[in-house]
Amino acid sequence: MEQLLLLGLNIHSMKTKRSVSIQFTKTRHIICKAHINGVAAQMLIDTGASSSCIHSELQEHFKLCRKGDTFNAAGASQGKMKAVLTRKSILQLGRHEVGKQAFVLLDLSHVNATLKIQGTLPIEGIIGADFLKKNKVIIDYRNRKLSL
């Protein structure tokens, strides 16, 4: 079977990827529906966030187990913030189980405050570059899909 390579992407394998619907906020942020350990979540897709995060107040809600001690994490707008890693949890995007994912528990109140001002529903977490790179995610803006 002949395969076409374009800009380093294997077009054949792109066709066999799973797709997940995404939505755009009024400010063009990308949102997708997810489940963490079977519990529904609204997640922000953020290519600039190095790690995937969950709002620290939701640790019990998502049945997340801490792993290690609290540390200082650097945020784009909040400077240093207290954070802690979680053990890997079952992550599902759309209707596709994508495997186990560790998260950083972080206070995302400032993110939700900004989203509220912009008329957007709050998020429970952020899907960051760690997940996006590991899973070779492609963001299809025209068709409003993530290809996994």
What would you call each of these model-derived segments?
Residues 1-148:
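Pepsin/retropepsin-fold aspartyl endopeptidases
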